[in-house]
Amino acid sequence: MSDGNDFAELLWENGQAVVHGRKKHPQPAFPPFGFFGGTGGGGGGSSSRAQERQPGGIDAFAKVGGGFGALGMAPAVHDFASGFGATTQDNGDDDTVPWIHYPIIDDEDAAAPAALAAADYGSDFFSELQAAAAAAAAAAPPTDLASLPASNHNGATNNRNAPVATTTTREPSKESHGGLSVPTTRAEPQPQPQLAAAKLPRSSGSGGGEGVMNFSLFSRPAVLARATLESAQRTQGTDNKASNVTASNRVESTVVQTASGPRSAPAFADQRAAAWPPQPKEMPFASTAAAPMAPAVNLHHEMGRDRAGRTMPVHKTEARKAPEATVATSSVCSGNGAGSDELWRQQKRKCQAQAECSASQDDDLDDEPGVLRKSGTRSTKRSRTAEVHNLSERRRRDRINEKMRALQELIPNCNKIDKASMLDEAIEYLKTLQLQVQMMSMGTGLCIPPMLLPTAMQHLQIPPMAHFPHLGMGLGYGMGVFDMSNTGALQMPPMPGAHFPCPMIPGASPQGLGIPGTSTMPMFGVPGQTIPSSASSVPPFASLAGLPVRPSGVPQVSGAMANMVQDQQQGIANQQQQCLNKEAIQGANPGDSQMQIIMQGDNENFRIPSSAQTKSSQFSDGTGKGTNARERDGAET
């Protein structure tokens, strides 16, 4: 190809199309495709400088192509890398490029490599498009970049540094949203004049319009490109600015900038994957991308209505709608995809935090009936405690009643019912028992007769005391005394050291004591209290100290024994009289006269008469030998 003195080379080397040319030369029939595009000002110049600073530019793109080799796109990447390498070498010093070692190709032979490339790339997939592709490649004239509308360049005079408006499509990647794999396309929105300038020659049907689609044979079939162009025009005509965000993800036209880095590099899909119809697949994606979000919003509404009859705030629904647009406009590019995913995660976290806050508030509301339930539980526990307490109190009362019944059985003649009366009876009974114990502990042998005891104690049988049997104070309990019927009174001196001195009662003997008499006798020093004696006299009997006493039988004693007892009693009486005399002399008081009278009575009357001795001897014989006893008595006198 030559234009005057200028020329360029198009070589086919190792399956790659290599184009070499000089500065200020027009573009070849296949202008190189800028691998990095952009719309910013000065993008072309900066990209060429960046590539000049990278001596291994072609190798770098070869590496990129190797990365896409697993997807079956290595040949296309190598082709475009060759074109890019040519561009970067043309921007530098041409003396360093070994283009002069290649043969020169004339104009009539320029279409041969294009036809060969068409045959190589198109024969495997669409055989019906081989002829049309070859004719389009042969009829494509050299296109100058000045004829294309340039946007936002830095004012450089070199047309190669200006951004090239090309129609590029990304790899129809299969993005997974909720388990749904849908092929999507991603491109940048382009101003309307450039889009019309780039696409209208294609739709006009003229042969010159095919030059706009640079390397369309290597990227995808012409049918797919035409379908995407029509869908883009239909989307731009029907969508407004509000819905343009979701509609622009179908097909977009991009001005590729070389300084944008490898992340924005176009990913060329395999031609088999590109043969899928994009339009039927894109519409379900728009509907299914928003479908998983609708149940979440409805879930929040249902939760709001279920708890406490309230509805969730409206801003939560709006917050859930925001990720829908982000998901619908997600691209294949790793940078944009990562940003959109991060934004979606942030929105999701915000919604979860708001849902947790509302749940905590609802839990606070739910705690109010919980408080009632707790209070009900406490009241139940309280009633249960009271019930246990009542049961223990009932058992305690039962034990008290049982003890009171046992006490009632112990108290004689106790027919009280109430507890106070029973306790009074028990107190009186205990007092009586205490008095009896004190009298028994004195050692005087005095026993309280039953008539002096309380009614509750009259049935008691107090055993006889034999400590002092010589006093004759058996009181009818088996301790017999001598018969004193001939004497008018029996005076008993008080016992020395006795707690209850009992003065002798003149001329009387109590009933049942074995002492005959008709007078009364004061008992135990209580003045005015007398005991009438109306019973007949009982024959007296003698008692011996230390001998067993039997109330039913009469002891058999001889006359000598009776004399011994009499002498003993007289000696004891003399000793008692002497003691009383000494006490009367030592202390003179109003009671001394009475004591002196008692002492005189003792001296005069405390003697056993002969008649008593005779009777005792008769009783002692027991066999009718009383005459012998009387004879002995007379002899003794």
UniProtKB/Swiss-Prot annotation:
Residues 384-397 are annotated as: Basic motif. Residues 384-433 form the bHLH domain. It comes from the Eukaryota. Keywords: DNA-binding, Nucleus, Transcription, Transcription regulation. Residues 35-46 have a biased composition (Gly residues). One of its GO terms (biological process) is negative regulation of red or far-red light signaling pathway. Residues 35-54, 146-213, 356-397, 601-637 are annotated as: Disordered. Induction: Down-regulated by light in dark-grown etiolated seedlings. GO terms for molecular function: DNA binding; DNA-binding transcription factor activity; protein dimerization activity. Its main location: nucleus. Residues 384-397, 628-637 have a biased composition (Basic and acidic residues). Residues 398-433 are annotated as: Helix-loop-helix motif. It is found in: Nucleus. Transcription factor that may act as negative regulator of phyB-dependent light signal transduction. Interacts with LF and PRR1. Belongs to the bHLH protein family. This is Transcription factor PHYTOCHROME INTERACTING FACTOR-LIKE 15. The lineage of its organism: Eukaryota, Viridiplantae, Streptophyta, Embryophyta, Tracheophyta. The gene is PIL15.
